Amino acid sequence: MRVWVLGSGSAGNAVLVESGGTRILIDAGFPVRELAKRLGAIGVSGESIESAIVTHEHTDHVRGVCAAAKKWKWTVYASTGTIAGHPLLEDICARPFAAGATLELGALSVETVRTPHDGTEPVAVVATARLTGARAGIIYDLGHVPASYRKTFERLDILVLESNHDEGMLRAGPYPPSVQSRIGGAYGHLSNRRAGAFARECVHAGLAQLVLAHLSERCNRPEIALRSMRDAVARTSFRGVMSAASQRAVCGPFTAGRNTRAAVAASQLSLEL
């Protein structure tokens, strides 16, 4: 299994998951031309992607999916609520599912789980490679972590986890109180502190890659988020590679497989665009 974060942040999110000849995209929050550019940077064509899963209807996750699906003949999956919240998904005949459903997509089995966010029916995903059993969890856009997540996201090989803001920077930042409340609220975005608390519960010795995602450019910094996470997991068994995804760069590949329990940092790319 290989995972690339094509970009992550308030201006656009997209994550490519590949295993056994199957390629799927989790979100397509960039215009189709930008998606093509980012895919091209890692030698992937849009036509080689079989399907896309939209986690929720907010623009930074869905912006390019309709045009990309038409251009590259993707099958698009989204929760029933997400389709209702973004009617253009109906125009491309997006296939609905209920949060909690498992999608069987070629060599990948993708479990969906409802997230606490202010979308209509938002989801996170766990993709499992049929051949190797490798598991990748992609969790962003959530204001808090439900207790059930510890079970859902255990024994992962790759974890892409939101670490959106530093709480002090959010309070001191440029946003009005209403926006601060939305971002920091129970249905907003996960702070560095809350991300660390969750990671401390679910990381383990076999987790090869921990990737921090959806970092705010105004209320966070990669070095702050990484330091906070390192402190949070310092006394756990985690011995994998920790990194921060970027809004402006393609990051990856993050790899896992039957015998891959330690990441090879030299194999990862950070391609500025």
Listing of model-derived features with the role each one plays in the protein:
Residues 26-29, 49-57, 77-80, 137-141, ...:
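Active-site neighborhood of phospho(di)ester-bond hydrolases with catalytic His/Asp-centered motifs
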Residues 4-14, 55-65, 69-70, 83-87, ...:
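Structured catalytic core of nucleotide-sugar glycosyltransferases
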Residues 147-246:
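Cap/insert and terminal regions of metallo-dependent hydrolase folds
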Residues 58-62, 83-85, 120, 144-147, ...:
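Active-site environment of divalent metal-dependent phosphoester hydrolases
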Residues 78-133:
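Metallo-beta-lactamase
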Residues 32-78, 157:
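Active-site metal-binding motif and surrounding structural segment of the metallo-beta-lactamase
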Residues 1-42, 122-141, 158:
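Conserved beta-strand hairpin/beta-sheet module of binuclear metal-dependent hydrolase folds
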Residues 256-273:
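Acidic, low-complexity intrinsically disordered tails
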